[in-house]
UniProtKB/Swiss-Prot annotation:
Protein source organism: Ectopseudomonas mendocina
Family: Belongs to the universal ribosomal protein uL30 family.
GO CC terms: ribonucleoprotein complex; ribosome
Upper lineage: Bacteria, Pseudomonadati, Pseudomonadota, Gammaproteobacteria, Pseudomonadales
Keywords associated with the record: Ribonucleoprotein, Ribosomal protein
The keyword Ribonucleoprotein appears for this protein: yes
Assembly, per entry: Part of the 50S ribosomal subunit.
Name used for this protein in its record: Large ribosomal subunit protein uL30
Protein origin, superkingdom: Bacteria
Amino acid sequence: ANTVKVTLIKSTNGRLANHKAXVK
């Protein structure tokens, strides 16, 4: 379960980073 959580968090952070880059 912990591994899945970490993966989810990483993918979410990646999405946020992509969103910020696109907004810039």
